[in-house]
Amino acid sequence: MSDRTSSVLGKASHSMIARAPFPHIVIREALPADLYVRLEATFPTKEILECGRPLAAAGRYAYSAASVAQDKRIDPAWRSFFAYHASDAFFQEVVSLFGATIREDHPHLEERLGRKLTQLRTNIRSQTPREDAALDVQFVYNSASLLPARIIGPHLDRPVALYAGLLYLRHPQDHSTGGDLEFWRFKGGRRMFQGGRKSVRKEDAERVQTIAYESNTLVFFPHSAHALHAVSERSPSVHPRLHVNLIAEFPDPIYHLEEGPA
């Protein structure tokens, strides 16, 4: 898995980075076909991902890298995938691709951390001792619902997070509509949050881009006060919505949620 062709960013280049409404990259057929087929066929069962929790309609269940590494029920291809994408080698891929964007959005970050992005020490989230950046990879299982369901509306992720990577693994027999990733921007040049939280009322923002929930599609973007996103309403389905979530985060926020000019 150290081969970059097995990385979700293996096909990425600087020329593929879109700037609006905030910097991001979309890669379709992100993984080699043979690897994707194996990963799709061995995605963990809901029983593994539930971890004994009751299954709720349209509920979200995540299973992180620290647990995957110890779980022999997980296929070796997945454990290798998780190990690489929670490694310093992958973090350096991200910095090589998005370093300039991260520095532009967070001009004082390296000064605060006391190191260049390329020099940051990483480890897997929840492991101790904690390093500069904690990395994680998660299986994410949004359970099926017999009613239309929206997973989450316009919001920003936690301000300690550096980036988000979403690799979609849509079930071949999933004929539902929706469940797509949406990019939004604030209206009227001002950031407005609900009660100081990360969520935003629809009337205070507008949807500007929709990225379809499609198999073997990667969406990757650095976090900032502008990275407003949502998931569209999904039609009833007997199939879960499946993806892998890629995360890096710091102990302290790298931006703030105060209202003001967008």
Where are these regions (language model features)?
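N-terminal regions that are enriched for targeting/export leaders
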Residues: 2-7, 119
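Short hydrophobic "helix-edge" motifs at membrane interfaces and signal-peptide entry regions
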Residues: 11-14, 216
